[in-house]
C-alpha cells in the first residue's frame, strides 16, 4: 500500500464537505473557542505560500481545540472591496464585481486544497449587498451617536489622476503612481470622531494579550501627551495658543512657528510679507505631510511680519511660518525652543534666531527666573506643576491633554466601496437613509475614473445622484463618496457570529456566546490601522450595549514574513527564477546580464512568490502544512525552501509505511505506549504554547524511536495519528481508518495522558573509579544496591584489574564510585 496524497486529500476533503465536519454550533454545554485569521483581500495574484503560515497556524489550533472538547468557530471570508479591482476596471471596463467573484473562486480553491477546517456556512464577502447593508447601518449608528460628521480637510489631490491620494501614495510632492504633481486642497469629507475614544483605546490595551510592539505602536499612534496650552498675545490684535509638554523650557522660547494651513494665518500676516507668505503656503501645500515632517529635510520658512509677546518676560517673539509644523498636531503653533529641541535648533540656525539655554545637563532649570516667576533649581514634574499653576493664575495658559491621534478621514472618491447612505439637499442639510432604504446599492457605470476634483465616480450616474426624496418631498442628491476598505473589516468578526441574520447585523445571544475572538492571527502591517479602527468601532458598540465585551480580540499573534530568493537586474528590475542560472557562483539572466540575488519578502512585484498549488501537486497539502510550521517560529521571519517541503513529504511516507506495516499488532506494548504518551504530552505543550514549529521535529523523533521497536502497538499508533491530525489532517484521517477506527478523526477526543507512562522506568548510574568517569549503567529503577554494585563492577572491570577496592561509594539512582 503506497501513500498517495493526491488521492487521499481529495477523498477526505470531499468527506468533510459532505458531513459539514467543521460547522460551528452555539453549544451551551461546551466552552467556546473563536479562532480567526485576518481575512484576505482576494487579489488577482492569488495566494502564495507566505499567506499560508498564519492560516495553517489557526487551523492547527482550531482542530486541536475541537479535539479537546471546545465548541470552535473558525470561519473565513473576503475583504473584497478595494482599489485593485477598481483599477482593473478602469483599464479594462470589467465590472469590479466580476473580477472580485473570479478572484474569490480562485482563493477558495487554493484554501480548500490545503484542507483548512473552516465553517464554510458562515462565508461572506464585504462587497455582498447582504453584508454591506449592515456596514451602512452601522455607519448610520455612528452618525446617530455624533461620531460621523462632515468637515473641510486638507487632502492630497492629483489633477492628472483626478483623485485624492493618501499620504502613503505621495512622495516629494509627486504621486508614486505615474509621478504626477500633487497639491494640497481643502475638500469636504466624511470623518469619524475616533479622538473621542482616545483614552478608552489606550486603557483597553493593558488587558490584551498582544505583542508588546503592537501595543506600543498603537500607544504611539494615539500619542497622549500631558502638557499645557500657552497663550501668546500678538502685538497686533489677537493671540496664538501653543501646546507644549516641555513647560520647563518656557523661558527658552525665542520665536513661534505656525503651520501653513492654520486658519488664523491670513489675519496674522503683515501686508509687506503677504506675497512671500502666500507663495510659501502654495509651495508647502504641494508636499505630503510625510515629506513635511521628515527629520532629514532642510527646514524652510518665511517671517509673517508679526510678533507675539512672551507671556512671562513680555519680550517680542517673531512669528514664522514653516511646513515642519502641521495643523493636525497640537494647535498648529509651535513655540520655538532651539536650545532644547533639534528641529527648532535647525530652524533657528537656518534663520539666525536666538538660542537660549534654560536646562542644564541634569535636567534642572537655569536662567529661568523673571520677577515673580522663579523656576531655577526645579526640574521634572515639579517644574511643570509650577509653570501650569503660574499661567492658570494669570489666565496665560491652562493644563491640557493632547493626542497625536486625529479623527479618521472616512470618505473615498472611489466606486468599489460601500456607498455612504446620506442624501444632501440644496439648503445644505442632509439626512441619513432609513432602514427600509438599505442597502443603498451603487449604480452601474461604464467609466470608473473619478469625476474631477471632489467628485467620485458615482457622480457620473446623474440619474442615480439626483433624486426626488419621497421621505421629505424634496429634491436631493445622494452622497457620491464611498467608504474606505477599512469599513467592512471593522466589524466582520461580529458578523461571523451570526453570518446570515437578515434582521440584525448579529444577535445578542450569538455575539455573547462567541465573543471575544480568542485567537487572532495576521500580519504586523495591520498593527495600527485595521486593529485600531476595529477596536474603535467595537468600543462604541460596547458603550451602547450592542456587544458584550469591551475589546474584540483577546490574543493577537503577528506571523513573521516569509522570505524567498529574488532576482534583480540592477537598473532594470526583477526577473523570475525561470529566467536566471548560476555559473561559477554568479547568477546570470538568460540575456547574459549579472543578477543580484537577495532574500526578500515574497510578493508578486518581486516575482518570488511560490504557488502553493504547484507544491501540493508535487508533495501534497499535508507536507506543505508541516513545512509551513517547520520553517520557523510563527512570529519570526523565515526563509522558504521547497526542498524543505520534500523533507516533510519523506517523513509522511515513512510514517504511512510504518502504520500500514505488518508489524502493527493489537497488543499492549509498554515501550510503544511510553513513546506515544510522551508524544501526546509534547504536542499538547507545543500547541498550547504556540510553539508550532517544533511539532514536526517531535514527530520525527517519535518515528525514529518507534520504528526501532520489535512490534508496533495499534493503540500507541492511534494516539500518534490522533495528535498528528491538527498539522497533517488528510493522512491522519486515512491512517485512522486503517487502524480500525470509524471515519471522522475530528470526532475523536484528544488522547488522555497517563502520567505513569511519563515516569522513567530505568535510571542511569554514573560509574567512577577514583572519582573519574569510567562508564555508565542503566538499570531498573527498583534494582537493589547489591545488584547495581555488581553490574557496575562489570562495566569498569578493566579499570579494576589487579587492584584492591578499598571503598564503594553508592548514591541511589545517581552514582557509584570505586576507590582503589
Swiss-Prot record:
GO annotation, cellular component aspect: cytosol
EC number(s) from the headed UniProt entry: 6.1.1.4
Compartment(s): Cytoplasm
Span of the signal peptide: none
Chain positions of motif 'KMSKS' region: 601-605
Top EC class, one word: ligase
Matches recorded under CDD domains: Anticodon_Ia_Leu_BEm (cd07958), LeuRS_core (cd00812)
InterPro entries from the UniProt entry: aa-tRNA-synth_I_CS, aa-tRNA-synth_Ia, Leu-tRNA-ligase, Leu_tRNA-synth_edit, M/V/L/I-tRNA-synth_anticd-bd, Methionyl/Leucyl_tRNA_Synth, Rossmann-like_a/b/a_fold, tRNAsynth_Ia_anticodon-bd
Catalytic activity: tRNA(Leu) + L-leucine + ATP = L-leucyl-tRNA(Leu) + AMP + diphosphate
Any one biological process term the GO annotation gives: leucyl-tRNA aminoacylation
Residues involved in ATP binding: 604
Pfam families: Anticodon_1 (PF08264), tRNA-synt_1 (PF00133), tRNA-synt_1_2 (PF13603), tRNA-synt_1g (PF09334)
Molecular function in Gene Ontology: aminoacyl-tRNA deacylase activity; ATP binding; leucine-tRNA ligase activity
Record's keyword terms, sorted: Aminoacyl-tRNA synthetase, ATP-binding, Cytoplasm, Ligase, Nucleotide-binding, Protein biosynthesis
Motif placement: 'HIGH' region: 40-51
Top-level taxon: Bacteria
Family from the record: Belongs to the class-I aminoacyl-tRNA synthetase family.
Name of the featured protein: Leucine--tRNA ligase
Amino acid at each position: 500500500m503506497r501513500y498517495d496524497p493526491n488521492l487521499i486529500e481529495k477523498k477526505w476533503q470531499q468527506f468533510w464537505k459532505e458531513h459539514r465536519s467543521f460547522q460551528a454550533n452555539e453549544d451551551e454545554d461546551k466552552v467556546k473557542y473563536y479562532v480567526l485569521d485576518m481575512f484576505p483581500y482576494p487579489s488577482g495574484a492569488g495566494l502564495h505560500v507566505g499567506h499560508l503560515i498564519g492560516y495553517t497556524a489557526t487551523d492547527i489550533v482550531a482542530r486541536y481545540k475541537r479535539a479537546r472538547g471546545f465548541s470552535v468557530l473558525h470561519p473565513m471570508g473576503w475583504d473584497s472591496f478595494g482599489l485593485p479591482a477598481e483599477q482593473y476596471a478602469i483599464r479594462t471596463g470589467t465590472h469590479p464585481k466580476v473580477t472580485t467573484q473570479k478572484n474569490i473562486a480562485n482563493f477558495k480553491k487554493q484554501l480548500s486544497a490545503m484542507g483548512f477546517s473552516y465553517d464554510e456556512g458562515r462565508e461572506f464577502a464585504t462587497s455582498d449587498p447582504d453584508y454591506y447593508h449592515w456596514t451602512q447601518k452601522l455607519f448610520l449608528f455612528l452618525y446617530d451617536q455624533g461620531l460621523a460628521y462632515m468637515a473641510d480637510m486638507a487632502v492630497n489631490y492629483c489633477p492628472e489622476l483626478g483623485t485624492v491620494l493618501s499620504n502613503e501614495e505621495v512622495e516629494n510632492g509627486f504621486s508614486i503612481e505615474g509621478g504626477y504633481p500633487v497639491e494640497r486642497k481643502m475638500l469636504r469629507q466624511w470623518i469619524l470622531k475616533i479622538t473621542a475614544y482616545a483614552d478608552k483605546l489606550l486603557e483597553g490595551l493593558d488587558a490584551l494579550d498582544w505583542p508588546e510592539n503592537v501595543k506600543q505602536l498603537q500607544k504611539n499612534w494615539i500619542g497622549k501627551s500631558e502638557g499645557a496650552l500657552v497663550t501668546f498675545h500678538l502685538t497686533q490684535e489677537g493671540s496664538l495658543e501653543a501646546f507644549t509638554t516641555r513647560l520647563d523650557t518656557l523661558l527658552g522660547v525665542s520665536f513661534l512657528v505656525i503651520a501653513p494651513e492654520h486658519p488664523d494665518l491670513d489675519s496674522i500676516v503683515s501686508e509687506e510679507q503677504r506675497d512671500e507668505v502666500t507663495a510659501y503656503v502654495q509651495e508647502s501645500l504641494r508636499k505630503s505631510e510625510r515629506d513635511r515632517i521628515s527629520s532629514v529635510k532642510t527646514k524652510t520658512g518665511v517671517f509673517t511680519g508679526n510678533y507675539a509677546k512672551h507671556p512671562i518676560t513680555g519680550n517680542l517673539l517673531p512669528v514664522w511660518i514653516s511646513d515642519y509644523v502641521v495643523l493636525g498636531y497640537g494647535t498648529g503653533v509651535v513655540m520655538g525652543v532651539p536650545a532644547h529641541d533639534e528641529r527648532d535648533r535647525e530652524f533657528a540656525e537656518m534663520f539666525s534666531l536666538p538660542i537660549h539655554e534654560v536646562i542644564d545637563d541634569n535636567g534642572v532649570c537655569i536662567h529661568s527666573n523673571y520677577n515673580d516667576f522663579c523656576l531655577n533649581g526645579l526640574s521634572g514634574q515639579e517644574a511643570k506643576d509650577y509653570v501650569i499653576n503660574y499661567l492658570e493664575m494669570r489666565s496665560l495658559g491652562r493644563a491640557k491633554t493632547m493626542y497625536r491621534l486625529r479623527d479618521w478621514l472616512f470618505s473615498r472618491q472611489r466606486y468599489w466601496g460601500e456607498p455612504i447612505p446620506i442624501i444632501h439637499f440644496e439648503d445644505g442639510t442632509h439626512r441619513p437613509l432609513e432602514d427600509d432604504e438599505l442597502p443603498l446599492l451603487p449604480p452601474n457605470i461604464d467609466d470608473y475614473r473619478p469625476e474631477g476634483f471632489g467628485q467620485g465616480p458615482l457622480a457620473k450616474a446623474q440619474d442615480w445622484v439626483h433624486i426626488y426624496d419621497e421621505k421629505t418631498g424634496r429634491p436631493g442628491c445622494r452622497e457620491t463618496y464611498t467608504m474606505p476598505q477599512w469599513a467592512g473589516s471593522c466589524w466582520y468578526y461580529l458578523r461571523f457570529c451570526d453570518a446570515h441574520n437578515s434582521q440584525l447585523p448579529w444577535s445578542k445571544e450569538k455575539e455573547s456566546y462567541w465573543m471575544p475572538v480568542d485567537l487572532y492571527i495576521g500580519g504586523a502591517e495591520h498593527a495600527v490601522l485595521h486593529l485600531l479602527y476595529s477596536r474603535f468601532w467595537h468600543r462604541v458598540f460596547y458603550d451602547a450595549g450592542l456587544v458584550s465585551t469591551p475589546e474584540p480580540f483577546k490574543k493577537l499573534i503577528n506571523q513573521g514574513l516569509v522570505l524567498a530568493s529574488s532576482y534583480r537586474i540592477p537598473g532594470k528590475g526583477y526577473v523570475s527564477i525561470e529566467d536566471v542560472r548560476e555559473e561559477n557562483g554568479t547568477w546570470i539572466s538568460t540575456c547574459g546580464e549579472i543578477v543580484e540575488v537577495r532574500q526578500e519578502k515574497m510578493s508578486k512585484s518581486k516575482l518570488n512568490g511560490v504557488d502553493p498549488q504547484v507544491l501540493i501537486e508535487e508533495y501534497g497539502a499535508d507536507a506543505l502544512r508541516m513545512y509551513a510550521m517547520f520553517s520557523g517560529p510563527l512570529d519570526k521571519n523565515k526563509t522558504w525552501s521547497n526542498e524543505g517541503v520534500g523533507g516533510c513529504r519523506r517523513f509522511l511516507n515513512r510514517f504511512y509505511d510504518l502504520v500500514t506495516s505488518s508489524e502493527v499488532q493489537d497488543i499492549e506494548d509498554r515501550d510503544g505506549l511510553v513513546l506515544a504518551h510522551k508524544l501526546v504530552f509534547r504536542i499538547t505543550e507545543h500547541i498550547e504554547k504556540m510553539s508550532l514549529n517544533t511539532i514536526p521535529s517531535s514527530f520525527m523523533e517519535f518515528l525514529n524511536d518507534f520504528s526501532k521497536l520489535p512490534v508496533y502497538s495499534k493503540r500507541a499508533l492511534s494516539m500518534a495519528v490522533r495528535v498528528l491530525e491538527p498539522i497533517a489532517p488528510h493522512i491522519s484521517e486515512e491512517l485512522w481508518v486503517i487502524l480500525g477506527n470509524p471515519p471522522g478523526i475530528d470526532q475523536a477526543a484528544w488522547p488522555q495522558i497517563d502520567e505513569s507512562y511519563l515516569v522513567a522506568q530505568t535510571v542511569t548510574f554514573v560509574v567512577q573509579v577514583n572519582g573519574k568517569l569510567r562508564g555508565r549503567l542503566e538499570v531498573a529503577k527498583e534494582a537493589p544496591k547489591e545488584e547495581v554494585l555488581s553490574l557496575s563492577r562489570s562495566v569498569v572491570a578493566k579499570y579494576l584489574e589487579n587492584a584492591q577496592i578499598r571503598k564503594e561509594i553508592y548514591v541511589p539512582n545517581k552514582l557509584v564510585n570505586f576507590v582503589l
